[in-house]
Amino acid sequence: MGFPKEGEKVQIHSYKHNGSIHRMWEETTILKGTQSLVIGANDRTVVTESDGRTWVTREPAICYFHANYWFNVIGMLREEGVYYYCNLSSPFAYDSEALKYIDYDLDIKVYPDMTYTLLDEDEYEKHSQIMQYPPVIDTILKRNVAHLTQWIHQRKGPFAPDFVDMWYERYLMYRN
């Protein structure tokens, strides 16, 4: 597996455990790309759902993917502050087609005051049965929910106070 290069524009593909496509983001600019970490940004990019419907993101977003963690984080810059959407997912993979991961349904929404809500537990339970997630997936995801909430409390990684603003400034250099 290679990794995307700084300044490169890539697609992001989200899959389900059974291999079906879940969602695709048309264009994300890579701000940092290594074997273990990818940071990207997009703004008003087209998103295609599995049923073919499309929509456009409303605000600039900084995307954080790590090869050692079972989650990715999207920091969305809004007037009221930075909101985060955290997807519990497989670590990312990258090939010539796109940056890819498997979405495992659970999400954490983090508000500008750093309070958060765990979302879609019912969807996770349903898909766990339908797609027959192995027990090890449940163990890994629970461990990563704990890890992610610890990062939120500690304002670590993508939740650090200046993280999103710093990477957004870098993104603006590529847009001009």
Curated annotation (Swiss-Prot):
Residues engaged in binding Mg(2+) 1: 87, 103, 107
Source taxon at top rank: Bacteria
InterPro entries membership: DUF402, FomD-like_sf, Ntdp-like, SA1684
Positions annotated to bind Mg(2+) 2: 105, 107, 120, 123
Cofactor(s) this protein requires: Mg(2+)
EC number: 3.6.1.15, 3.6.1.6
Keyword list, A-Z: Hydrolase, Magnesium, Metal-binding
Pfam name, any one: DUF402
Reaction catalyzed: a ribonucleoside 5'-triphosphate + H2O = a ribonucleoside 5'-diphosphate + phosphate + H(+); a ribonucleoside 5'-diphosphate + H2O = a ribonucleoside 5'-phosphate + phosphate + H(+)
GO molecular function, one term: ribonucleoside triphosphate phosphatase activity
Active site as annotated: 23
Function: Has nucleoside phosphatase activity towards nucleoside triphosphates and nucleoside diphosphates.
Similarity comment: Belongs to the Ntdp family.
The protein's name in its UniProt record: Nucleoside triphosphate/diphosphate phosphatase
Lineage: Bacteria, Bacillati, Bacillota, Bacilli, Bacillales
